[in-house]
């Protein structure tokens, strides 16, 4: 396997049955994510995008096909190994920030680091460094309720990056933001990709920004198509 390939899925299929009829939500998907890639996936609701992200994040199992992370099959990993992979090698950004309201900015960012058994001091130091990269170091002691929607999503991005993952998976990260904050988030993602060489896999419907995508795929009826001219 090419050492630059972080994640690869081969002939990935996910099916369910309705009255003995097989319904395929994903149909023989093959995909490669390389180090430093920014890959966008677009497509209509119900086309299979969320199902694909769940499989790639180890949150569900395919009906057939394989998923390799750094050359190792997720199928061969135990549930504990997959959980460790999700915490250390993968970062996740969702439509809603999912910040803990009783934790301040620094404490929210530090959570994945603490889960990975880092000390409180090391976790705080790592969190502050990534906080500077999302340009929110002046908000270090603020609580989510004291932040704007765009700032809360930037904290969520910092939390996804605190363990220096190889790949960040983002599901509609700007869907709840206005145009200006959405632009800030996408500009930040491209900046972080350039500075950290972190790969991003982003599901988005925001046509204003996916036009900038170096790799653009479209999901149609459970299949992926290259949509970049």
From Swiss-Prot:
EC number: 7.6.2.-
Family annotation (CDD domains): ABC_MJ0796_LolCDE_FtsE
Subcellular location: Cell inner membrane
InterPro entries xrefs: AAA+_ATPase (IPR003593), ABC_transporter-like_ATP-bd (IPR003439), ABC_transporter-like_CS (IPR017871), ABC_transpr_LolD-like (IPR015854), LolD_lipo_ATP-bd (IPR011924), MacB-like_ATP-bd (IPR017911), P-loop_NTPase (IPR027417)
Primary localisation category: membrane
Every ABC transporter domain range: 7-229
Enzyme class, spelled out: translocase
Topological relation to the membrane, as annotated: Peripheral membrane protein
GO cellular component, as recorded: plasma membrane
Family of this protein: Belongs to the ABC transporter superfamily. Lipoprotein translocase (TC 3.A.1.125) family.
Function: Part of the ABC transporter complex LolCDE involved in the translocation of mature outer membrane-directed lipoproteins, from the inner membrane to the periplasmic chaperone, LolA. Responsible for the formation of the LolA-lipoprotein complex in an ATP-dependent manner.
Summary of subunit composition and partner proteins: The complex is composed of two ATP-binding proteins (LolD) and two transmembrane proteins (LolC and LolE).
Protein name: Lipoprotein-releasing system ATP-binding protein LolD
Organism (species): Buchnera aphidicola subsp. Schizaphis graminum (strain Sg)
This protein's encoding gene: lolD
């Amino acid at each position: 396997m090419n050492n630059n390939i972080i994640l690869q899925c081969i002939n990935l299929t996910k099916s369910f049955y309705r009255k003995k009829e097989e319904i395929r939500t994903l149909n023989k998907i093959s995909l490669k994510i390389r180090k430093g890639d920014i890959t966008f996936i677009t497509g209509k609701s119900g086309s299979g995008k969320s199902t694909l992200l769940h499989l790639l994040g180890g949150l569900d199992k395919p009906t057939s096909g394989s998923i390799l992370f750094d050359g190792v099959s997720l199928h061969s990993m135990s549930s504990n190994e997959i959980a460790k992979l999700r915490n250390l090698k993968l970062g996740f950004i969702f439509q809603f920030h999912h910040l803990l309201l009783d934790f301040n900015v620094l404490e929210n960012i530090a959570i994945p680091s603490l889960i990975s058994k880092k000390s409180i001091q090391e976790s705080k130091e790592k969190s502050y460094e990534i906080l500077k990269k999302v340009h929110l170091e002046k908000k270090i002691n603020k609580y989510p309720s004291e932040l704007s929607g765009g700032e809360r999503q930037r904290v969520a991005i910092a939390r996804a990056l605190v363990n220096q993952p190889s790949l960040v998976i983002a599901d509609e990260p700007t869907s709840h933001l206005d145009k200006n904050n959405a632009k800030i988030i996408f500009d930040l993602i491209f900046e972080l990709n350039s500075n950290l060489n972190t790969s991003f896999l982003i599901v988005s419907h925001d046509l204003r920004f996916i036009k900038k995508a170096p790799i653009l795929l479209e999901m149609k009826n459970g299949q992926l198509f290259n949509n970049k001219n």
